[in-house]
Amino acid sequence: LHLLSRRQRQMCIRDSNTIGRHISKMVYTKVVSNKSPWLQKAELGGVYCNPASHGEGRFVASDEWIGRLFANGQVATQYVSADGELSGDEEWNVNGSYANIEGITSPDGRVLGKMAHSERRDNGVAVNIYGEQDIRIFESGVEYFK
């Protein structure tokens, strides 16, 4: 949570998954803000399927702080169904994150933190999984920071 301000860190935490064990599966996430340079090549509203593999990582915050993060464009991605719909069901929101939050950014967008492992996708990997897998984080970042 270092990408949040000191005050935001006091109000937001990363917690253990609600199921109490390690998760390893493909998850669907929707880009809800492309304020971050890391998401400039991702489609706003686009749904991407990437591996999740973690035991900790559920995003927890008060409704007030979640509202502030959304208002500032800091909520970058949310867990969704394969159809792009928000769902509290653990099939889709695999770790029980509040407001289905999967990825957040620093206030200026230059730091991105997310749970799904975009770096684990490649051509020929998970070819039997439905959905777009390349959120183009690294391509976006390289173009912005070069």
Give each language-model segment a name.
Residues 1-13:
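Single conserved hydrophobic/aromatic residue that forms the stacking wall/gate
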Residues 14-146:
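Amide-donor transfer/coupling interface in amidating biosynthetic enzymes
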